[in-house]
Amino acid sequence: MRMDMYHTKILKAIESEDYISVRRRVLRQLVESLIYEGIITPARIEKEEQILFLIQGLDEDNKSVTYECYGRERITFGRISIDSLIVRVQDGKQEIQSVAQFLEEVFRVVNVEQTKLDSFIHELEQTIFKDTIAQYERCNKLKYTQKSYDELENHLIDGHPYHPSYKARIGFQYRDNFRYGYEFMRPIKLIWIAAHKKNATVGYENEVIYDKILKSEVGERKLEAYKERIHSMGCDPKQYLFIPVHPWQWENFIISNYAEDIQDKGIIYLGESADDYCAQQSMRTLRNVTNPKRPYVKVSLNILNTSTLRTLKPYSVASAPAISNWLSNVVSQDSYLRDESRVILLKEFSSVMYDTNKKATYGSLGCIWRESVHHYLGEQEDAVPFNGLYAKEKDGTPIIDAWLNKYGIENWLRLLIQKAIIPVIHLVVEHGIALESHGQNMILVHKEGLPVRIALKDFHEGLEFYRPFLKEMNKCPDFTKMHKTYANGKMNDFFEMDRIECLQEMVLDALFLFNVGELAFVLADKYEWKEESFWMIVVEEIENHFRKYPHLKDRFESIQLYTPTFYAEQLTKRRLYIDVESLVHEVPNPLYRARQLNIQKSVATGGNYANC
């Protein structure tokens, strides 16, 4: 058999040291999350500033086996950090070589459904395989800080810093991974199809904008050619909508699962896009390589990545433009968000979907157009994905190292909080709208590394509100008019929550625990900047901001950002258990501790911080 280029690269990657490094990382994140989420309860032996964790298991002969590792419980949300290799102890000690063996042995002691365990093991093994290839191919010709925003979207290859199956991409074969994985920067052509209006719809009240985006994205000449093709099939172009499709989705899912629709001309293949596109970190969002200022295109992908199926739910596609319009109006009427912080909303301004109400194809054919960040960048401004702020070069150097050295850690950190974090909190406190502001949903706009402002994105599934806490309830969209799923849904299913605590949990979980907290780790581990000091500065800047808005005092207190503990999502547990009452666990809040320390510091110096 003749080996192709991809096959040769894969063999070299697996034989390299990168395979061992990636396997160690996946196992480390796996053990950290299992302990942190309380899925396993190892014995703990305190040893100076470290903890020796002893994890019990049973081998296939039901003989006792122990896994050992050293780590710490962090100030930042009580997160667990494993600092040593993880070794298997049974007739001697040996570093773990197999994710499958570790989980099989540990879960003979802890009960879990075998099919769920097998599925999770597969995700982890695929993550090791696919990240090994990415790390082996990693390009270090330029430092990260020398790269543009678009380049960073492709070069930030490390994936989720907490989730252990951060690069599973279940559905992609190895050639698919090379062709469509964002790390490999292969340009692709979108597939355009015509979809009959009996099953195809545009976003709610979005027809005019949809027509405009088609002319812009396809071009009038090509649009006419597409209409002629529909005519030649004996159909009326006025009865069809045009939808861009990811080429992998077309080849591997649409053709086989929509064969009946293709046969009866419910779907008509039109051709490839003129422009080239390239995947961003989220995989299903594509940037226009030919014309970078043109919109990003978010399309359905029937792959499982970071434990989530990357399709687009029809109801969320339907409401996407309305949500962006709502948020845009809110920001435009808030002088702080509009003029002072100059927050950028990358609006999801148009959308289209095809839905036959069949379970097997649900969410598999849809598109959302989102504004490009390049549309907003001013002179001398550049941008970096927020998760890039806690990423590292291959040698372990933080990519923000040069910026910290140039501006000083405290000065740079305070600016970051003022320009990027405070606007998200202000939106919750002033307006009652919480965004899922994790690392991929935020973009820092900077000038030579100095934080300037924040761009926020991906609103169609990442927003929550508690109706009694909305500043202007009458401005909130009526989602029940937009899609039948909303009309048939209940509280907490979508955007509307039944308690104000949900807004608090969204901010503490998405913004701080799994996003800003990672930056606290980088500063602590690489620069010996204490986590306590980090969170004290965060609290100082939050309170400095809200002192300027005394009318928000009661609303700020209602959010209870300084609660001693809160309930965080269990990302790993949800891969192992389905029939459980709750997939959250109680964790300590570093903002509470930091505020207490700030009060003590103020009292000691004769201040009145506690009365602020």
Swiss-Prot record:
Its EC number is 6.3.2.-. The keyword Ligase applies. Coiled coil: none annotated. It catalyses: N(8)-citryl-spermidine + spermidine + ATP = N(8),N'(8)-citryl-bis(spermidine) + AMP + diphosphate + H(+); N(1)-(3,4-dihydroxybenzoyl)-N(8)-citryl-spermidine + spermidine + ATP = N(1)-(3,4-dihydroxybenzoyl)-N(8),N'(8)-citryl-bis(spermidine) + AMP + diphosphate + H(+). Keywords: ATP-binding, Ligase, Nucleotide-binding. The keyword Ligase applies. Signal peptide: none annotated. Pfam families: FhuF, IucA_IucC. It comes from the Bacteria. Homodimer. Involved in the biosynthesis of petrobactin, a catecholate siderophore that functions in both iron acquisition and virulence. Catalyzes the ATP-dependent condensation of spermidine with N(8)-citryl-spermidine or N(1)-(3,4-dihydroxbenzoyl)-N(8)-citryl-spermidine, two intermediates in petrobactin biosynthesis pathway. This is Citryl-spermidine/3,4-dihydroxybenzoyl-citryl-spermidine:spermidine ligase. The lineage of its organism: Bacteria, Bacillati, Bacillota, Bacilli, Bacillales.
